[in-house]
Amino acid sequence: MADRTPKRSADGLIHDAKPSKVTKNDRPPVIDFKRILAAKIAEKRGGPPVSAVSLIAASTVSTPAPVTYGSVGLPTRQLSDSDDDDEEDNATAKTHSVPIPVFKPPDQLTAPHTVKRKPTQPPTPTRPVHQAQATQRRPVVSYDTTGRRATTQDEITDAFGELDNELRRLAALTPVPGGWPESTRGERNQMVNPVGVKELPIVVQSITDRAIQIENRLEAQFHGATEMVKTVVPTVSVRGGVFTRHVITDTKRQPFLIEACEFIPSMIQEAPIPFRAVASKPFAAGTKLLTPKAGAPAVDLRAAPVLGKGYFGTVYKVGNLACKVQHGRVMPGVSNAISDVVEESLLGSRLQHPNIITFVKGFLYHGAVNTEAVCVSLWELGLMDLLSFTQQSFWQPGKDACDPLVKRYLARRFEKHTLLGLEHLHERGLMHRDIKSQNIFIFTNRGRLVAKLGDLGCCSKGAFCDAGGTRAYFPPETLAINVQCCASDMWAWGVTMWEVHTGRTPFWGGTDISMQKVFRYTGGFDNRAYNQLAVARHAMAAADSAVKPVPDLEGLMERGKVSLSPSFTDIMKSVLRLNPNDRATASDLLKSPRYTDESLTEGCECTDRKSLEKNAPEMIRLLEHNHLPPQKVIMTTDPHERDQLAEKERWGQVPMEVTGDFRPAPLYMPWLARADMGDDHTAKKLITLTPRDLVSVYPVVATKEYGVKEIRVYRPPEFSPTYDIVYLELKPTIDFEAIQSLMEGIQAIQKSIPYVVPVFHYTLGAHGTKRYMIYVTPAKRSITELNFDGETDDGTLLGAVILKQLISLAVAFRDNGINFITNMYNTHILYHDPRGVDIGPLKLDMVIYMLLHQTNNLNVYKLSSTDRTLRDPGDPVLKTCLAAYTYVKLLMSAPRALERLVPKTTISACKRFDDFFMIPTVKKISIPPDTKIKVPKLFSFIKIEPPQDISGGTVYASGTLS
């Protein structure tokens, strides 16, 4: 007879054994689904393939309950993870007849060995049916993921807890009616369900899908967390505030139709209720994009030498300029790449600094979609970038190397120059986001080498933003949780300067190796907690980081075999810190004794942009994009205009950028959030406008010209008395799209004309046939409330001061390309600031004026005279001066006083506006200075009561103030 001794195979299964009746407890094996997920993620990322059996067996946690085998004679014991225990059990095992099949992965499965039974043998199994009972399972930790968490680490813990809960629910072994058809030991001597094994790919796919959903939601939570302190990109900007355009159709509220414009509450600006935005045409008025003249001289780039190539485009040499050609590619995480390159041009045009490269001209070729777009920008051209400079023979060790003292002096110059450029950006709330040696350019001026920051394509605004730039220069917070701030620029600057001194970055290597080095020398994850999965899940948090008081740069230098001066080492220790809040700023470093030598800044002078513009080509010809219409990106019109980004003290000077749909929006200015937002307002509060809050009502006579039926001015107690809410009931025939164009024109002139009433927010609404407009402005009073008969403190007649202001208003309009019309002198639209001196400054409400008088053409740049009361066919300047003179005399109870001070005959002799201002009695009159207006915090929305005012509907309005 054949030997029936049980044989043990390498996989731990017993062969040549009869199928036995297995009495098994109802406790199913507990599976560690995190290990399943980690293995599948590793396989997806190119790791070794894992089979279904090994996957489930390797992730199964032994259940301490005993398993009783029936008449087969197998030993009764607890399942163990130890192979030694299995061998001991096999030593005492009895003989068996029929082999138990060895289960393989699904792709290698063969038909299982079936047991032949006698026909008279009943097929009903005698063993109990397996039923998974939750009460007999190992206690499962259930995480409460519904509560609010205080830290990012709590959110991560909750996400992993939710993942564990979902995986346990989805991936439990499926019970089979009538019991398992076969039950056997699998790898590592654990119970394996063959049906579950066959269904494992489906289960794992379900696990993977669910994990991806949770991961996406978690990433969205992280994105939302960064957005909490990030300024939302609005659609249109104004003097002193921001327009956010909302439209309500009936009572339905729809989200903004603007990419990457999600409104999230934050400490910087509150969240408006999102409404459906009226679509506007690209390149509308105020976009700073103008079509160049036909037949302008052009340059063909096919003959231009190539300076470099990158993912976004190519840089050519055109004369003494660098021509950057960028294509509008939509990348992951970038909603509108072409808007970014246009923004770079507009940013460069407004950043005038000796250590930032000068922008010269910009051109845009735009088609029907964003991918059909090319942005061409001309910049001043330097010698080379800093990386190429440090690769020259005189910088590298060897016989041709320059003197070490000269080398260290040049490095100090470059350090200070780049710090000055970063200070200029950070003071304006801007992050460079891509500081590296390739983006620092070397110039010569008066025999001196000058370093300048370039490549502003990644430049961003706000307190925090998503990661951008080059990974080798990323700080730990960017590597771990994918955010950047101004302190991230300082880290990248430190890495760059380390590279200049040593020839290599301090934390070289791959992503994970680089992170390990960062944490090793600056403090961070405990080694037991650090793993690839944690990094992939952005699991870094301050609570889990053992931050070192001072980075261990000595150990880093010893390991890298480099030697640095003590002063430079101290600088590096102040910027290469794990906690961004502990890093020194550019302003802090510039106070260091290392940079006090004034000779370090010799040759640092602002480039004369006008001289570069004279030699720049009028147009760049792109033959491969002939089907795209060219447009020119226009800079500031006034050549003597100061850097608007530096105008901190004037509330009206708001720097501009271009959003995704090419409408300008203000750059984030941190001083507005700190100082200008009044503390007397409560954010996220409902404002109800009741009849008790009504200050004044102006019924408008119904004529064909007027588009407004009624004007109401509210001053609710929740608002400071320095602000008004204006409600305009519009005619049903009014065109919302025309009003949108009007507001885009108004925002452009509010930025540059101090005589326009600033509008902090406006909303257009419709309910049935009712149409309305609500906007928030500073409190104002009609000019008729002024006392024109008195005198100022210096004895000047008040009427003469008003007259000079009116003429100055006309001059300001003319300088901005607007034909001032005489019927703007109207009591309904001229106001003065009640918080200032008694006589002004005067303000013109362009919104009411345009809707009252210019409904046929709501383009403020196309105003034409419609006042036929003045029949003087003379010069428009004379008409304007005489109209203002007549208006002031009508408001004065003693008009002869004005005649004595400023005779009408003298005004009639004026042929230019300058002639009026040269009148001796007018020349000495001083106009009151414009006052700084604090922008209030945003209320969540504004509600009009009673609702029957708009035929039973409810009006909601909200906006962004900055």
From Swiss-Prot:
Residues 143-152 have a biased composition (Polar residues). ATP binds at residues 307-315, 324. Its EC number is 2.7.11.1. The active site is at residue 434. The keyword NADP does not apply. InterPro entries: Kinase-like_dom_sf, Prot_kinase_dom, Ser/Thr_kinase_AS, Ser_Thr_kinase. Transmembrane segments: none annotated. One of its GO terms (molecular function) is ATP binding. It is an enzyme of class 2 (transferase). SMART domains: S_TKc (SM00220). It holds the Pfam family Pkinase. Residues 301-595 form the Protein kinase domain. Gene3D superfamilies: Transferase(Phosphotransferase) domain 1. Residues 1-28, 62-152 are annotated as: Disordered. It catalyses: L-seryl-[protein] + ATP = O-phospho-L-seryl-[protein] + ADP + H(+); L-threonyl-[protein] + ATP = O-phospho-L-threonyl-[protein] + ADP + H(+). Keywords: ATP-binding, Kinase, Nucleotide-binding, Serine/threonine-protein kinase, Transferase. Residues 81-90 have a biased composition (Acidic residues). Belongs to the protein kinase superfamily. Ser/Thr protein kinase family. This is Protein kinase ORF73. The gene is ORF73.
